[in-house]
Structure formats: structure tokens, C-alpha cells
């Protein structure tokens, strides 16, 4: 069964690209996936996006978790990730997934998965190294990002209707002192946030917003 695509890639007259969600009518600057496979428990995958325009009151862009999934079988897990990737990728483009490329177990599973896909003439599934993955402080980097973006009064991280917020609330109270992959939801979400937290438009914010508003009203650009 074909996967229905809900994202369109649009480009302003000045060349600034953005993603348009056909279901919610939201406009994103970037969409990425975060993927964590711990081997000993369920793997976790998230799709998240950062708003194109800044919230002027918070002086920050909202980040939205669009989808999530967890699976215990690696092949089923990777197929779910691929399905989500197609669902949230615009036509003729593929959003990137970020994960722990230093994990021997995960990379071996991924290599086997892709060997089968190549044998059948299907495009492989690629995972890009997540930000701060090799940094000594990575155990705190990802949880700190989640705490920062969910703090009262300045919340910019928003979740779809899933169990992820409840899981995170309980887990973030604990001291995460082991491998980040021991906490797949933290890892997968953290990988995505690490990318989206640094996204900026190529054009200056006021210029982009003004251009968009002129396009909407039909006034000359």
C-alpha cells in the first residue's frame, strides 16, 4: 500500500525554501527524524519539525513532534522509520534521519537491512551522525535540550497525541548516567532537537515574513 505524502516543499520568490504541512497548514523551516536502537529494549523513532517563523514573544521558533513509533524487532523498526520518512518527505526529496552511528550493533543491523534492499534494487536507508554524539557531555546534552524547550513559561517543544510526554516527564527526573541509548525516547528526540535547535533561515527573519505576507495578500513582491 502506498504511503500518503502530507508535506509539500515550497520556495519563495527570493529562493527561501520551506515545508508546508497539508493537514495542519503549518509551515516549517526544517523536518528531520531521530532514531535510537538500544538492542536490549524497543527502538524509538521521532519525526520533528521547526517552525519557519519565530515566535516574537518568546524570541524562539516552536519545535513540533509530528510522529513517533517504537518497535522491538529491528527490521519492523526500520520499515516503520522508512514509512514515516516517506510520509513526511516532500515529493522527490527525503528528510534526513539522525542517530548513533558509533553503535556497532545498530550499524550492523542497518548494514544487513540495506544489503537486502540493494539486492532488491531498492534505495538504502541512511542514518546521519547526530550532533554532539561524540562529545563527552552527550549524556547531559540531549536531556538538557528537552528540559530547556519544555520549561514552564517558555515552552517551545510540542508533542502530537502520544505517550511520549508522559514518559519523558518521569524519566527526566532521574539522573541519566548510563549510555544515552538506554533511554531510546530521550535519544531519538534529542538527536532531532540537536539538529533543529540550530536551524536558521537563509534570509533575515523580517524579510522572509514580509515576503510571505505579500504573497498571501497578492500584493506585488
Predicted regions and their residues:
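Short acidic, Gly/Ser-rich segments with clustered Asp/Glu that frequently serve as metal-coordination loops
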Residues: 32-44
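Acidic active-site catalytic centers that drive phospho-/nucleotidyl reactions
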Residues: 36, 100, 184-187
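Mg2+-dependent endonuclease catalytic cores in nucleic-acid-processing enzymes, primarily RNase H-like
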Residues: 56-178, 199, 215, 219-221
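Acidic two-metal-ion nuclease catalytic site recognized across multiple nuclease folds
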Residues: 3-13, 193-221
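Peripheral docking tails and interdomain loops at the edges
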Residues: 178-184
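ATPase catalytic-site recognition across NTP-hydrolyzing enzymes
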Residues: 1-35
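Short loop/turn segments immediately following beta-strands, especially the blade-tip
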Residues: 50-55
